[in-house]
Amino acid sequence: MENNAPVPKLLLQLISSAFQRCRLAEDLCRLSVLLDQSTERDPPITCISIADTGIGCNLEEFQNLRCPREFNGAKIWDGLLSVKTTCFTDDEVYYYHINLDEYIANKRLKRQPSQAKNGAKFSGTEVSLSVFGSMDVLVAPIIGFFQKIIVLQILNVTLDLMVKQGTSPGNQTQYVFAVNADKTPCFTASNLERLKSGLEDYVLRHANCLDTMCDYCFSDREHLKVGSGTVCQEDKHKRVGGTMEVVIVISDLLESTQHCSRSCNGKTEVLYFDNFLPSPVPHLALSALKKIDWKKYGLILANVNDQDGHVFLEWDNFPSYVQIQIALHWYHNQYPTRQKNGPGISLLKKGIKNALDNLKAKHEGFLLSSHSRKICSYVPDLARSIAGLIFSSTDLDFQGDCLSVLGFQTQEVERDTVENYIQRKIVTVIGMNERKPQKDQEAAPFLFFDGESETSFFEDEEVEGEYYSSSLE
């Protein structure tokens, strides 16, 4: 089987349904996937089990599943799903066989003899099937799916994958996927707070390939710059509304990152989640990303690389030591729902822009446009001149008044302290003015005096390719 083979896609559909059943349950749940390959046959056959302790399945989940028995001329499976399921209130465990090759409804599903629970109270579902082909083609997509799904930090669900090849205990491998215990939001945290925390971990642990933060690339999570945005779509007529959440994490890598084989290559990965499940980035989201005015944030988008829904953004003149990660999550206000409507371009653009503006507002002099960066390049000299005027004056009353205006209570303050403070204030005002609508920017007042001069002190020369202003030291 190849990477685009139908069986891995079918498995991810079945795992997605199992995860939703666990997420909707009120209790702690477990989702376990077992791949048990017999090496005695040629080609080898793999028995697959997807088990969860969620709310119990609705057989309608299997109505639209399709998976051919053959791929590229070779038989890949027998087309049969075995399902056993029960709800907490049921007295029995129900067994079914589902033939995915059958299109006639009453022939597609066959009920098997059920089993009494003898008064036991539990719920859960197990789906089993057998396939032919390479184990690697099955394992890699499942691991990638689990690595992304824990970004959402759904705390009541634990995930594990067991891989067996042959009967020897040495040929068994177990993968357990868990959220970072050191930085876990509480159960009452909002979906957005969970997404922010989960994306931070995803960055620090190199796409969750590591169990802990990469010490080569990061010192601690406090150095991450995080912005978030939310846009809501109200219910309208018979259309169920939804919420678009966007989180952007930007990090400066340590110099030792050159020793890390997993360090970033300057590209920005875009993660997309649809109703709490990892999903390929839809075309509307791609269009929204292309329509963002990235230059307003000091970024120059060079290319959008779409690899079957796995999307990377590439930048021009981008610092090699900077990493950007973007996560988009769209979910309906009511779930489950039969509607498949997603967010429009305008909603996606607004969510991304809100996250960028939030990041910009939280960090002074960060993500400034090229024009504002040019203005900021003059700020150190301006602050140095103002501080010089204050401290060179022999009029102590004048000094005291100036320091008081700046918020200092004593004339014993150091000149460097005053100079740095003036720099920060000017950069803050520049950033605030840049976040205003364009019509308000044009009428922005002067920083230190009232004036009506329309003289421009700076040319419109572009300074591109820088993502934040020079450090204020």
Curated annotation (Swiss-Prot):
Subcellular location: Chromosome; Nucleus; Cytoplasm
A Gene Ontology cellular-component term: condensed chromosome
Organ and tissue specificity: Expressed ubiquitously in different tissues, including roots, stems, leaves, seedlings, inflorescences, siliques and pollen grains, specially as a higher level in inflorescence.
A GO biological process held by the record: meiotic DNA double-strand break formation
Keywords for the protein's UniProt record, in alphabetical order: Chromosome, Cytoplasm, Meiosis, Nucleus
InterPro entries referenced in this protein's UniProt entry, alphabetically: MTOPVIB_plant (IPR034566)
Chief subcellular location: nucleus
GO MF annotation, one: DNA topoisomerase type II (double strand cut, ATP-hydrolyzing) activity
Phenotype reported upon loss of the gene: Defective in meiosis. Sterility due to male and female gamete developmental defects leading to disturbed embryo sac development and abnormal pollen formation. Strong reduction in bivalent formation at metaphase I caused by defects in meiotic double-strand breaks (DSB) formation. Impaired homologous chromosome synapsis and recombination.
Domain text: Despite a weak sequence similarity, retains most of the structural features of the ancestral archaeal Top6B subunit (AC O05207), including the transducer domain that interacts with the SPO11 subunit and the ATP-binding fold, also named GHKL fold.
Classification via PANTHER family: TYPE 2 DNA TOPOISOMERASE 6 SUBUNIT B-LIKE
UniProt family annotation: Belongs to the TOP6B-like family.
Subunit-level organization: Heterotetramer of 2 SPO11 (SPO11-1 and/or SPO11-2) and 2 MTOPVIB chains. Interacts with SPO11-1 and SPO11-2. Binds to PRD1.
Functional description taken from the UniProt entry: Component of a topoisomerase 6 complex specifically required for meiotic recombination. Together with SPO11 (SPO11-1 and SPO11-2), mediates DNA cleavage that forms the double-strand breaks (DSB) that initiate meiotic recombination. The complex promotes relaxation of negative and positive supercoiled DNA and DNA decatenation through cleavage and ligation cycles.
Listed name of the protein: Type 2 DNA topoisomerase 6 subunit B-like
